Amino acid sequence: MGNLNVTKLQNKEEHANYIHHLMNDLEALDLMLKADLIEKEPIRIGAEQEFFIVDDAFYPNNNALEILKEINDEHFTTEIGNFNLEINLDPLELKTDCFSKLEDQLLAFLEKAKRAAIKNNSKILLTGILPTLSLKHITLENMTPIQRYLVLNEAIKESRNQEFHIHIKGVDELSLMHDSVMLERCNTSFQTHLQINPDTFIDSYNWSQAIAGPVLSICANSPLLFGKELWAESRIALFTQSVDTRANSFLLNENQSRVSFANNWETVTITDIYRDNVSRFRSLVTSDYITNSVDMIERGKIPKLKALGLHNGTVYRWNRVCYGVGNGKPHLRIENRYIPSGPTVADEIANMMFWVGLMVGKPETYNNIHEKWDFKDVKTNFFSAARYGMGTQFIWNGKYISSQQLILEELLPMAYKGLYCYGINPTDAEKYLTIIENRVSTNNGSQWIIKNYRELSKTKRKFEAAQIITSQMYKKQEHNYPIASWNLISENDININSSHFYVKHVMSTDIFLVKKEDSL
């Protein structure tokens, strides 16, 4: 929801006016598709990097606006949490050394953020969910004081008319009620974009759904939330519930939440995907719309489809369809939203290359996959990967196969082939896809965190264990060493200043029920 100037829809007239603009934008998109106005080539890639801002004790630091002012770069923008920022990277054509260029670009931006953070007594950290987060960090006081976030929070709360109920069961179980959408800011991601030829968009979108589970399994990096060991990629469960506009008592009566993996294959056009979203999810906010999109096309101009873009920004499919205009030319993209931030920039670029390689390397045998595979198998794969990461058994071509075997024997060769077809430098392909391959025999981010958390918890309180893990993540990110090369934390690595200890580091939070007649 990138538009800063938004207001809550207040009455029937405003709703009707907004729906009119939405319908006009949908008609305009149909006209552009029929007139062959959508750009087909070159194919470009892009990304958005979200990150946490932490203090010297590795707890969230509520000073994003001060750091943003110090950075003073239009590539950076705010998030709903005042301890998060986002970088919008420049798109690059999919060719030769685009991935290493993207890594260099991202490292340069992060260095800029790091310098600004240091001036504000802060650090920046890449991780899917910050291990040191606690409930006190996700109050409205820590929401970025910008109107659009307050408007969105109020609109979602009004549509629910009750508090948010979060219930996630993994190794541990988390169940809580919360009064705002700030739970959503426990998550940060590395959102990757791939431009898609409009002639093959639906087939490409269905393929992006088919590969989502295996890709997520190797990328998982978010196993802890509030000291609880939950899913390998807990962001999937948390985000789904944290912005759910459905009331708790009516969850069984609605097919899907605003955060979804969808329920079926897509079989028509991208306009129908948008149209389904519009019909399924009511509009929450509005903005100013100066021009009529259909009229613009008739006058030979390209519209930005602002109303449609605003609505799309409040519907959070894990693979989201996107329309954009670059250099005066309209294009279509798929935005991959399920890949977490971190563990390092090198890991993130490897994740992106793996996904892009699979997207452009799809063998002909997987064309029209909606006619061959059961969508429920694909959806099961995705949520199994979110729960179990590299321990997932996938249903692939109607048979069960381990994540490791599927990635090594079929998907990595497929990704190499796709990348070579687009002229990606073999050196770059080898560099980044080897990072993926090495994780199979060692750890992804989630596995590394859990192994250390369990070991540290034998001698430390959970808050101290989380703090130690976060400090080590920060140190290793500074060197940009891929996660597969990270050793487990040793006693020699632990160097947390005692001034950063709190009562909770030594206090037990277990509750025991004792009656007066019980012997102690």
Pin down the residues of each PLM region.
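Phosphate/nucleotide-binding catalytic core
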Residues: 1-520
